[in-house]
């Protein structure tokens, strides 16, 4: 069962990176137990696979027709957030951001800080800085392809 566990988690890593960002947290938690998974971890991984099976037809639709875009924010916009000391093992904070283009997510990130922040404000500042760096990248991208979208 350990070999099955490892190969299944490895396969899910591919899905997370390319098609299923909604599995990122679950897969990252399972990666922590790759060397010695217990029955609890195997049962949990089977629940993830059932979730994957039941949500196989769920996806993102990128439709830029005028009829659908009337009810959707246009251009590039993003959000960020941080959770101060939310990891009970390390007391590290989680930072996250997501950027949308024409209503569809095009870039996202969620990760534990590499260091311990001293306050909620510090955690939020770090998340804002990370999101601003990503917004700058998108600005350069749109400038390079000859169009201009403002990040909101």
Question: Where does each model-flagged region fall?
Answer:
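Divalent metal-binding acidic/histidine catalytic loops
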Residues: 1-152
């Amino acid at each position: 069962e350990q070999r099955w566990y490892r190969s299944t988690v490895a396969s899910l890593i591919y899905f997370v990176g390319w098609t299923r960002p909604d599995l990122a947290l679950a897969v990252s938690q399972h990666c922590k137990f790759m060397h010695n998974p217990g029955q609890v971890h195997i049962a949990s991984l089977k629940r993830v696979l059932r979730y994957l099976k039941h949500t196989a037809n769920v996806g993102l639709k990128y439709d830029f027709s005028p009829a659908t875009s009337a009810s959707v924010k246009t251009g590039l916009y993003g959000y960020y957030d941080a959770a101060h000391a939310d990891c009970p093992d390390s007391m590290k904070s989680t930072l996250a951001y997501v950027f949308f283009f024409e209503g569809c997510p095009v870039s996202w990130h969620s990760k534990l800080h590499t260091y311990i922040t001293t306050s909620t404000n510090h955690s939020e500042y770090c998340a804002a800085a990370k999101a601003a760096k990503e917004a700058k990248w998108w600005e350069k991208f749109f400038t390079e392809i000859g169009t201009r979208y403002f990040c909101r």
